[in-house]
Structure formats: C-alpha cells, structure tokens
Amino acid sequence: MIIVYRLTQELREKLKKPLGILIRGSFSETIKKFSDIMEKEKSPRIISVGDTVSKILVTNNIFPQLSIVDNKVMRKSIKPIALGADETVMVGNPAGTITEEALTAIQKALESNSRVKIVVDGEEDLLTLIAVLHAPENSFVVYGQP
C-alpha cells in the first residue's frame, strides 16, 4: 500500500473547521436545506463522504454519483448501507492517510458515468479532500461534520 499523503498535527487542527457551506440542524432540517440549495444550483454531480451522510441522502431520494464509506459511524462498525450503486470498489486507506489506491479509485469514479460506491478498509474522512480536488466544477461534495 502506497501512502501518498499523511495527516500532520497542524493540518489536523485546520481540518476541524468545515470547508464550504455548513448546514446545521436535524437530519430533516439539513436535508430540506440541502435540497433547496441543490434545486437552486443545479449541480452536475453529488459526491457523499461518510456512511451517515450517504444513507440520509439515499433515504431522501438523492443519489450521489460517488459515495465513499467505511461501514463505520463514529468509529463503530455498522451494517453495510445499500446505496444502489452500479459498481462497488474496495480500497485500503489507513486512518490519517490518503493512499494511492484510494486516490486513483476516486479519480476513476469521477470520470465514470456510473454510480460508484467506494468502501474503505480504514478511514474515509481525508478522502473528502481528494473528492473536492477532483470533482467536476460546481459539484457538491457532502460530508458529515461531528
């Protein structure tokens, strides 16, 4: 496994602050606000990072083109979520890193017209950065903020 990036303590502190628009509220409030933003912006693609966010979107008939999950919520294992993806890709990505395997899988998924679910053995949090970096312009990258 080739580690391309490793999280430093300095960057860990910076990443505690949300990137982009923070939508606060209950699940129902945030999904309503997000739906309103989607309707207004007419984004070409939605990318979800995290099991809870991905499940909430799909439960509300919002289907991400790419979902990145690790089958964990708050570091506790959960039953895998059915996201209706056309393709599922498994990658390794230890906590606090970004691996070449994960980076390449995200790039390929975003080049595809299929709905892709990337299941991470390790941790998916930092992969949000790769999704933002490689997403088509005006895409929505949606992730949970503890």
Where do the protein language model's features map onto the residues?
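Active-site helix-to-loop segments that bind/position phosphate- or nucleotide-bearing substrates
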Residues: 2
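Conserved mixed alpha/beta catalytic, RNA-binding, or beta-rich assembly cores of soluble enzyme
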Residues: 5, 9-146
